[in-house]
A protein has these predicted regions:
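Glycine/small-residue-rich loop that forms an oxyanion/phosphate-binding "nest" at active or ligand-binding sites
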Residues: 75-124
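Short active-site oxyanion
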Residues: 33-39, 114-118, 166-167
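General beta-strand structural signal in soluble alpha/beta enzymes
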Residues: 41, 117-122, 169, 195
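Conserved helicase motor
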Residues: 64-72, 146-149
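A contiguous loop/helix-start segment that scaffolds small-molecule binding in enzyme catalytic cores
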Residues: 9, 87, 166, 173-286
């Protein structure tokens, strides 16, 4: 199906683009790219190539660069275009805008000024990694890129150590080995993790194991491509049934079964389903 020009209401359209395979884009996203008055991109070459692949004519339209290095200078100009009643389509270099992406300040300013901000959802490396990584997805925390320096990286990992959900990071091939070493040291060598690289591309690979095992793999291999790292939540194996029952009993004094299960699962790191089943049984036994 060829993209078609459609009538768009004035505003800012945040368009998710493929993270690897060019066909991983929605029909709606293609229609928006075919119809917007002005195209804005983190990487103009990537957007132009995507449009060429899908047969979207650029015509006389502008393709304006908006990235970390020029955002402060470009925002007033883009806000001026919105003020004129134009439609702007913004695309990340890859994936969903706002996720480790420079478009946040633009979207926030547009919304604060009263302009319509619309999402055309689609690919995301975070969600794709969670889908194939083999770690719990009921709760997760996306932390973006860790600091480059080992000391700062360890400090950040300590802050994340107690978060009751799967940790999600972006990392570069040059730093993945050092990150794994620091994560094993700070979070413990036995925590399970996954390294997901080149997602949706020809050489997609998911490496699973403990942090210690993955540290060894990274020391022996030179991993290439874009990388997402998943690390499981802190182990809850030391939570005994009696302790869990006590926590649930306290929570149930002022909460519904569902809310109590949510609160205790978040506190202990246990799977919500397991906690909910126990809470339900306790409620029925009363």
């Amino acid at each position: 199906m060829n993209p078609k020009a459609i009538k768009l209401n004035p505003g800012l359209y945040l368009v998710a683009t493929p993270i690897g395979t060019a066909r991983d884009i929605t029909l709606r996203a293609l229609d928006i790219l075919a119809s917007a008055d002005v195209l804005v991109a983190e990487d103009t070459r990537t957007l132009r190539k995507l449009m060429e692949i899908h047969g979207i004519p650029l015509g006389e339209r502008q393709v304006m660069a908006y990235h970390d290095h020029n955002g402060a200078q470009m925002r007033p100009r883009l806000m001026g275009l919105l003020e004129q009643g134009l439609t702007l389509a913004y695309a990340s270099e890859a994936g969903t805008p706002m996720i480790a992406d420079p478009g946040f300040d633009l979207a926030r300013e547009a919304r604060a000024a009263g302009y319509t901000v619309v999402a055309a959802p689609g690919p995301s490396a975070v969600v794709t990694a969670l889908t194939v990584g083999g770690l719990p997805t009921d709760r997760f925390f996306f932390a973006g890129f860790l600091p480059n320096a080992s000391g700062q990286r360890k400090t950040a990992l300590r802050r994340y150590a107690e978060i009751p959900g799967t940790l999600v990071f972006y990392e570069s091939p040059k730093r993945i080995a050092a990150m794994m070493r620091d994560a094993a040291e700070v979070l413990g060598p036995d925590r399970r993790a996954a390294i997901c690289r080149e997602l949706t591309k020809k050489f997609e690979e998911v490496l699973g194991g403990t942090l210690a095992e993955l540290t060894t793999i990274c020391a022996d291999r030179s991993l290439k491509g874009e990388i997402v790292v998943l690390i499981e939540r802190k182990s809850s194996e030391n939570i005994h049934d009696s302790d869990l029952e006590t926590l649930l009993r306290e929570a149930l004094t002022g909460m519904t079964v569902r809310d109590a299960a949510d609160a205790v699962a978040a506190r202990t790191g246990l799977a919500r389903r397991q906690v909910y089943q126990m809470a339900l049984k306790m409620e029925q036994d009363e």
